[in-house]
Regions:
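Short, Lys/Arg-rich N-terminal segment immediately upstream of the first membrane anchor
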Residues: 1-4
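Hydrophobic membrane-insertion alpha-helices, especially the h-region
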Residues: 7-25
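Basic, mixed-charge low-complexity alpha-helical segments
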Residues: 9, 27-31, 160
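N-terminal export/targeting and maturation segments
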Residues: 20-107
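Extracytoplasmic electrostatic interaction patches
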Residues: 74, 80-175
Length: 175
């Protein structure tokens, strides 16, 4: 075989390999896109949040929708988006806490004191556990209780904010 034929075979092999890899990665990206859309449409909230927060891939879209996420460098360092800030009736931070839930953190004023609230929510964004903390006069963070009606009122606000986020993200991604 002549030298030109060997070179042409090598070049053709490289072109086929590069084209194959490019098509494979485009296919994978399209599959992820369709899986996320299906999860949105099936209201599989935990899977949607998991996919949105798994890497920096959707960070620009989340920012475009008007939400706050860490800088890209921090996302790469952490291996994903650790929290999303939703500014609305309450300033809410949500994070994906595992396979079965979402953590929601926010601060509100109760009886003239700033109260930190932490909710663990299930796939329907119902509370599985909640905790409320205030800083006392000795500057110590202590757990406090709130009434059931107040917790229900706050939960409705949190659910509304997260539902709004989900709808806005669907609109941003799929128009």
């Amino acid at each position: 075989m002549s030298g030109h034929k060997k070179i042409l075979i090598v070049i053709a092999s490289v072109i086929v390999l590069v084209t194959g890899l490019t098509l494979y990665f485009q296919y994978q990206s399209h599959q992820e896109y369709l899986q996320l859309k299906t999860s949105f449409e099936e209201r599989d909230n935990i899977v949607v949040l998991q996919r949105l927060m798994a890497s920096e891939k959707y960070a620009p879209d989340i920012r475009k929708a008007g939400y706050v996420v860490p800088p890209d460098g921090a996302i790469r360092l952490d291996g994903g988006i650790d929290s999303i800030e939703i500014k609305g009736d309450i300033d809410l931070k949500i994070s994906h806490s595992g396979r079965n839930g979402v953590t929601a953190y926010f601060e509100i004023e109760i009886d003239g004191k700033i109260t930190s609230a932490l909710y663990e929510l299930d796939k329907n964004f119902d509370i599985t556990s909640s905790a409320y903390f205030q800083i006392n006069e000795k500057n110590i963070n202590e757990r406090v209780n709130i009434s059931q009606s107040e917790e229900e009122r706050l939960l409705k606000i949190v659910q509304s904010e997260i539902d709004g986020f989900m709808k806005k993200m669907y609109q941003t991604l799929y128009g």
